[in-house]
Each structure stands twice: as structure tokens, then as C-alpha cells.
């Protein structure tokens, strides 16, 4: 796992791209709990997302799960490959399976997220 990632309690990850944007996806743990992903409902570019609010839905053979934004900002890019290949979330949750890129409204929100070590400790307790 990439040690520079930040995580939420609801199993989303965030990668700071260093240019005022972040990439968001779901963790390996989350995709394992969901099982085989069959559909991802992506937001639109220019949609506003709010920290803690649902912005996407991932459907798997087991369940449909809301995806919550870890940060507030504007969607600047969506992973269009997920429309035809939603299984990328299972195969490459931290690389090809990213969901959106968001331009941050408040970069300090990143400070509220867990680092990789804190996140791994929290899922071991589940």
C-alpha cells in the first residue's frame, strides 16, 4: 500500500496530487468486502462534492455501496474506464481503479484523514 495515501473511516482513499487536486478511490479492504464490482455510478465533471457526503455508488455482486467524499471541492476528472471496466476497482484499487479527481476547496481537510498506518490499525480491529 502507498504510504502517502490518506484514508477515511468509510474506506475511501485520497492521494494528494500536489497541484491542488486529489485522486479518490476505495480501499483494498472495501473492494474485498464488496466482492466483484459490476457497476460504478460516476458523478459529472464540474459537480461539487462535500466532505462526508455521498458522490458515487459502487454496485457489486453482493451489495450497492455509497462512496463518500473525503474532501470538499469540484470534480475535475472522472475515471471513464470504470464505465466499461468496473472490475478495475477490484484489480487495482489504488491505481487503475481510482474513481474521481477533485480540486480542493480546503486543503486543510486532508489533515483530518487517517494515514496508512492508522487506517490499517483500524481495519484490523473490525
Swiss-Prot record:
Binds 1 lipoyl cofactor covalently. InterPro entries: Biotin_lipoyl (IPR000089), GCV_H (IPR002930), GCV_H/Fam206 (IPR033753), GCV_H_sub (IPR017453), Single_hybrid_motif (IPR011053). Residues 21-103 form the Lipoyl-binding domain. Gene3D superfamilies: 2.40.50.100. The keyword Transcription does not apply. CDD domains: GCS_H. Keywords: Lipoyl. The modification N6-lipoyllysine is found at residue 62. One of its GO terms (cellular component) is cytosol. One of its GO terms (biological process) is glycine decarboxylation via glycine cleavage system. The keyword Manganese does not apply. Its cofactor is (R)-lipoate. Belongs to the GcvH family. The glycine cleavage system is composed of four proteins: P, T, L and H. The glycine cleavage system catalyzes the degradation of glycine. The H protein shuttles the methylamine group of glycine from the P protein to the T protein. This is Glycine cleavage system H protein. It comes from Vibrio parahaemolyticus serotype O3:K6 (strain RIMD 2210633). The gene is gcvH.
Amino acid at each position: 500500500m502507498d504510504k502517502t495515501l490518506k484514508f477515511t473511516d468509510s474506506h475511501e482513499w485520497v492521494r494528494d496530487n500536489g497541484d491542488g487536486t486529489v485522486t479518490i478511490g476505495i480501499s483494498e479492504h472495501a473492494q474485498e468486502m464488496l466482492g466483484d464490482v459490476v457497476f460504478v455510478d460516476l458523478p459529472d465533471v464540474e459537480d461539487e462534492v462535500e466532505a462526508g457526503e455521498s458522490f458515487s455508488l459502487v454496485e457489486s455482486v453482493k451489495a450497492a455501496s455509497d462512496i463518500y467524499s473525503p474532501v470538499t471541492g469540484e470534480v475535475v476528472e472522472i475515471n471513464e474506464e470504470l464505465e466499461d471496466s468496473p472490475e478495475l476497482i477490484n484489480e487495482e484499487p489504488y491505481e487503475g481503479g481510482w474513481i474521481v479527481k477533485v480540486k480542493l476547496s480546503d486543503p486543510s481537510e486532508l489533515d483530518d484523514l487517517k494515514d496508512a498506518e492508522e487506517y490499517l490499525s483500524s481495519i484490523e480491529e473490525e
